[in-house]
Regions:
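Extended alpha-helical targeting/anchoring segments
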Residues: 1-342
Length: 342
């Protein structure tokens, strides 16, 4: 709604999640999980933008880098392991924000909007809340084990009121990426569970690619990605370089495609982000009307669900994950959300 002036957000905010959290990362440890290598980075940020401060900013960065090296060489305290199969721990109960009958009513209303020609597709979701007495970082460690994904994140943050919270996720999907002047998006739509055997796995993959509904939905979202990139890329540079391949994850497989384009030199990564947000795979098509329908049919604001977790760097690059399979934790309560494309 910040760049679509006709859109209004009327669904109530029930969880108090901040709309945006931005951080300037000055000191960074980059871990290559394949090679086991670690790079320590201390950015010399001259916030005053004065030449007289440049040398001081550099010297401060060098001092911080030296301290990071000393900290990295210090053995970490011995922490107890997390037993993810501990059956002595009482299993907390999920609390569904939306009753089944109310969700079904929302789906039927969404289908009518499609029949009426308002949208081709819309994603209707609901929130689940659960008590979470565990240490948030233990939650992340378990998630890495049970559901590894291309984007894994653990964020310890503070909102404007000074309240601490965590965002923990394992997203499989990129919203948008910019690398050296090239924009990339990787629409994911269509899914099946992983098979118990290689033969069953292959059977499910063939069924998925033969499903007309799944394929139709996927092609529509590929076209939406092409349209998003065409707004910010050099004319005729947008192309589908990979169409409808099966990508397998620990518990699920998806149909995935890749759309790329050369970013207009007069634009920045922020412009590219604006063209793609929110994700069509989490809202629908056309996006503005789909967002209006979601705001009408869902009983509460989505919070981080369907938003993004990622970074902009000093070189003009960007990598943004769609915030799905993501939990918001505060005061020993976790909220997660899931949706279905109609």
């Amino acid at each position: 709604r910040h760049w679509e002036p006709t859109l209004r957000a009327e669904a109530p905010d029930e969880t108090g999640q901040p709309e945006t959290v931005l951080a300037l990362a000055t000191d960074i440890a980059v871990v290559d999980h394949v090679s086991g290598s670690v790079w320590l980075i201390a950015n010399a940020v001259n916030v005053d933008d004065k030449s007289t401060r440049a040398d001081a900013a550099y010297n401060e960065a060098v001092a911080r880098l030296d301290q990071m090296q000393r900290d990295a060489a210090t053995p970490a305290p011995d922490e107890s392991r997390v037993n993810i199969l501990d059956e002595t721990v009482a299993q907390p109960e999920l609390r569904f924000r939306t009753e089944k009958s109310h969700y079904e009513q929302a789906v039927e209303r969404a289908k009518q909007y499609i029949v009426d020609g308002d949208v081709f597709q819309v994603v209707i979701s609901q929130r689940l809340d659960i008590d979470s007495p565990a240490d948030p970082f233990d939650v992340y460690r378990v998630l890495r084990t049970l559901n590894p994904s291309p984007y894994m994140y653990f964020m310890a943050l503070t909102d404007a009121q000074g309240r601490d919270f965590n965002v923990i996720g394992s997203s499989p999907e990129t919203l948008i990426k910019v690398d050296n002047g090239h924009a990339m998006t990787f629409p994911i739509a269509g899914s099946r569970p992983r098979g118990a055997t290689p033969e069953e796995d292959e059977k499910f993959a063939k069924e998925l690619l033969a499903d007309p509904k799944e394929c139709s939905e996927h092609i529509m979202l590929v076209d939406l990605s092409r349209n998003d990139l065409s707004k910010v890329c050099v004319p005729q540079s947008v192309e589908v370089v990979q169409l409808m391949d099966i990508k397998r994850f620990s518990h699920i497989m998806h149909i995935c495609s890749t759309v790329t384009g050369k970013v207009d030199p007069s634009l920045t990564a922020f412009d590219v982000f604006k063209s793609a947000f929110p994700a069509g795979t989490l809202s629908g098509a056309p996006k503005p009307r789909a967002v209006e329908i979601i705001d009408e049919l869902e009983p509460a604001d989505r919070g981080i669900y369907g938003g993004t977790v990622g970074y902009f760097d000093f070189s003009g690059n960007m990598d943004m994950a769609i915030a799905i399979r993501t939990a918001f934790l505060r005061d020993h309560e976790a909220s997660v959300q899931a949706g279905a494309g109609i």
